[in-house]
């Protein structure tokens, strides 16, 4: 087969069993009933139990995607894991996935692209499929509950745990695939885990809160996320000479309902075409798009020829958009 493009061949997702309703967090933070939903659109999120690991959640989503694709596991040539919460700083977690999933001929690498991680992995996977003619497993997973600082309201109300996965396979059809990324490192510190890296390494005297997530300026995050997601989406649509009305389904990063609404308004994609899993699963960073994609495919299977738009923005600040055809 002459490989002309890549195609979405399989979808998977996984979430922990534990449901954390807003009432539990509102009581802990001393917030009035309904405060979280009014400001974020979130009603519930999933948090992992202490004995659950990122690798287990990622493997569950990946196993579902591989089964859905119906591709021999020995054919998978590369496994990419987008995560901000790997099992360990070293070694990477992706090789463990390939071991558990019996992907004997697959390379493996972790990607740290924050909320945009899945899009970076998707673009790299597309390039690999086109160059090598072999399928790639892309997984995005996070256990953000392990990084929440319950003393900081801005981040405590948003984040959940989830995993999503897709298999990208070679296609003889010339399916459209366009991408655009935007980075603004001047806002590098808007969302961060202050310590734990080489700049501020672990030391016993450091306060435990330094190893948890902090987001001190929610307004600036909102403004920058909308700018990046909207700008990247508009650029990728312009590159494809496509009007926003031609998009069949829009999969925005599920950061906050206000961000999703504003991006839809700005780029001109009808809100009804935008996936919405935020209410039930919260913000799981890079995992939100493949989670939404897998759930949407279960509810209403993707049809050949559909045009999909993905957009994300997150810590760094970094973000982007991908336009692809099923």
Swiss-Prot record:
GO terms for molecular function: 3-oxoacyl-[acyl-carrier-protein] synthase activity. Residues 254-258 are annotated as: ACP-binding. Gene3D superfamilies: 3.40.47.10. Its EC number is 2.3.1.-. SUPFAM superfamilies: Thiolase-like. It catalyses: malonyl-[ACP] + an acyl-CoA + H(+) = a 3-oxoacyl-[ACP] + CO2 + CoA; glutaryl-CoA + malonyl-[ACP] + H(+) = 3-oxo-6-carboxyhexanoyl-[ACP] + CO2 + CoA. Keywords: Acyltransferase, Biotin biosynthesis, Transferase. The keyword Cell membrane does not apply. Pfam families: ACP_syn_III, ACP_syn_III_C. GO terms for biological process: biotin biosynthetic process; fatty acid biosynthetic process; secondary metabolite biosynthetic process. Pathway: Cofactor biosynthesis; biotin biosynthesis. The active site is at residues 115, 253, 283. Involved in the formation of the biotin precursor pimeloyl-ACP. Catalyzes the condensation of glutaryl-CoA, an intermediate in lysine degradation, with malonyl-ACP to produce 3-oxopimeloyl-ACP. Belongs to the thiolase-like superfamily. BioZ family. PANTHER family: 3-OXOACYL-[ACYL-CARRIER-PROTEIN] SYNTHASE 3 (PTHR34069), BETA-KETOACYL-[ACYL-CARRIER-PROTEIN] SYNTHASE III (PTHR34069:SF2). This is 3-oxopimeloyl-[acyl-carrier-protein] synthase. It comes from Brucella abortus (strain 2308). The lineage of its organism: Bacteria, Pseudomonadati, Pseudomonadota, Alphaproteobacteria, Hyphomicrobiales.
């Amino acid at each position: 087969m002459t490989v002309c493009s890549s195609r979405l061949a399989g979808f998977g997702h996984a979430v922990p069993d534990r449901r954390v309703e807003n009432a539990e967090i509102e009581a802990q933070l001393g917030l009035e009933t309904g405060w979280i939903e009014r400001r974020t659109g979130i009603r519930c999120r999933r948090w992992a139990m202490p004995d659950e690991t990122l690798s287990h959640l990622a493997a569950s989503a990946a196993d579902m995607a591989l089964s859905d694709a119906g591709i021999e596991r020995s054919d998978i040539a590369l496994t990419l894991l987008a995560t901000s919460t790997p099992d360990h700083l070293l070694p990477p977690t992706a090789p463990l996935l390939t071991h558990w999933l019996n992907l004997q001929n697959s390379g493996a690498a972790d990607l740290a692209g924050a909320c945009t991680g899945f899009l970076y992995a998707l673009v790299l996977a597309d390039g690999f499929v086109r160059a090598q003619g072999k399928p790639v497993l892309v997984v995005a997973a996070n256990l953000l509950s392990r990084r929440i600082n319950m003393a900081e309201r801005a981040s405590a109300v948003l984040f959940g745990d989830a995993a999503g996965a897709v298999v990208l396979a070679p296609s003889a059809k010339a399916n459209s695939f366009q991408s655009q990324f935007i980075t603004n490192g001047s806002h590098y510190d808007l969302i961060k885990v202050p310590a734990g890296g080489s700049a501020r390494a672990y030391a016993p005297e450091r306060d435990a809160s330094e190893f948890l997530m902090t987001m001190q300026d929610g307004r600036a995050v909102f403004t920058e996320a909308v700018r990046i997601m909207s700008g990247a989406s508009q650029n990728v649509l312009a590159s494809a000479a496509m009007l926003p009305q031609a998009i069949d389904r829009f999969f925005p990063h599920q950061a906050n309902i206000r961000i999703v609404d504003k991006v839809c308004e700005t780029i001109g994609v009808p809100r009804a075409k935008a996936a919405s899993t935020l209410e039930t699963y919260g913000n799981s960073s890079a995992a939100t798009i493949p989670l939404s994609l897998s759930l949407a495919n279960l509810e209403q299977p993707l049809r050949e020829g559909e045009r999909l738009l993905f957009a994300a923005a997150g810590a760094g600040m970094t973000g982007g958009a991908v336009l692809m055809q099923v």
